[in-house]
């Protein structure tokens, strides 16, 4: 690495380390290097080789290519190490947001780490797209497409993430086929995925019985700040709720207005509220929070 880029890389690694609460010694142990190495780097007394850079990226569970791109943005003055470290921290779904893990496992065969991995995979894809758009002077994806199309795209990314992170339990079905995720081995099941914005109810074109996993998201800023209301929507997708449940055809409310090409089957409110809440980020709650019991779908 050239010197300016190397120094930016070191500063970024340091900021991420501090944001995660890691000591120099702990990071060194995770990277498999001598305990004095991190101190020498941060003091500017040593610059990282390609091998060492790769070890540090691996220790932080981040792609080296991504860290190098971010170091380049620091050199250009586009952002700071502290901002990037905060984004990395907030874009990593937290285990404390998992609820009813036993129901997630019993209904879908998925473990919490698989769900968290799928969400993080989606975030990484979205952020990569936004970085490329920004590099060409464009606007973020959330401002480039209609919200209905954004929901569809995010749903596809989440579906791909589940398949990727499921340790072989699931593969994606072909486009526009039911169910979205096909089981490959026990305890996986036919799994339909639905996506909705904010407080909207997940819906499809036809009522279909089966096992459902639903995701709802909000639009905040890149640091995770979120304010309720359409006028306050940001440009960064944040998953705030995931639910799972067994749904029958009678659990849908259907609309079929003559001449209306947009036939819809929406999961009934009481049924949806009773579905097991398996991921919940209160910081991004689009409802008015109750004094007791979170929100109407909390369980």
Q: PLM features: residue spans?
A:
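A short, Lys/Arg-rich alpha-helix, primarily the initiator
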Residues: 1-19
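Short alpha-helical DNA-recognition segment
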Residues: 21-40
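Alpha-helical residues within the helix-turn-helix
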Residues: 18, 29, 58
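Residues within the helices of the helix-turn-helix
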Residues: 14, 25, 54
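Short amphipathic recognition helices of helix-turn-helix/homeodomain-type DNA-binding modules
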Residues: 66-83
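Conserved catalytic cores of phosphodiester-cleaving nucleases, focusing on short active-site segments
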Residues: 181, 187-195
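DNA major-groove recognition helix of helix-turn-helix/homeodomain DNA-binding modules
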Residues: 51-66
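Nucleic-acid endonuclease domains
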Residues: 82-179, 195-299
């Amino acid at each position: 690495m050239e010197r300016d880029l190397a120094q930016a890389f070191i500063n970024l690694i340091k900021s991420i380390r501090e944001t995660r609460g890691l000591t120099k010694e702990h990071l060194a142990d995770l990277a498999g290097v001598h305990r004095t190495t991190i101190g020498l780097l941060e003091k500017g007394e040593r610059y990282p080789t390609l091998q060492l850079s790769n070890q540090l990226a691996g220790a932080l569970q981040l792609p080296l290519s991504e860290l190098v791109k971010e170091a380049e943005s620091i050199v250009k003055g586009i952002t700071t190490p502290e901002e990037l470290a905060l984004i990395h921290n907030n874009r990593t779904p937290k285990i404390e947001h998992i609820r009813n893990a036993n129901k997630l496992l019993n209904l879908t065969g998925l473990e919490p780490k698989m769900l968290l991995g799928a969400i993080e995979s989606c975030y990484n894809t979205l952020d990569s797209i936004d970085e490329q758009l920004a590099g060409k002077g464009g606007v973020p994806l959330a401002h480039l497409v209609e919200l209905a199309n954004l929901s569809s795209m995010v749903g596809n990314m989440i579906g791909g993430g589940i398949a990727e992170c499921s340790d072989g339990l699931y593969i994606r079905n072909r486009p526009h086929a039911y169910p979205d995720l096909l089981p490959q081995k026990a305890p996986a099941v036919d799994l339909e995925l639905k996506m909705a914005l904010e407080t909207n109810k997940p819906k499809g074109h036809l009522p279909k019985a089966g096992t459902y996993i639903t995701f709802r998201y909000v639009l905040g800023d890149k640091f995770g700040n979120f304010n309720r209301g359409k006028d306050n929507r940001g440009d960064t997708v944040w998953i705030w709720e995931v639910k799972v449940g067994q749904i029958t055809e009678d659990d849908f409310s259907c609309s079929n207005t003559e001449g209306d090409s947009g036939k819809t089957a929406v999961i009934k409110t009481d049924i949806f509220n009773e579905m097991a809440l398996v991921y919940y980020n209160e910081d991004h709650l689009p409802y008015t929070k109750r004094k007791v019991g979170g929100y109407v779908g909390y369980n």
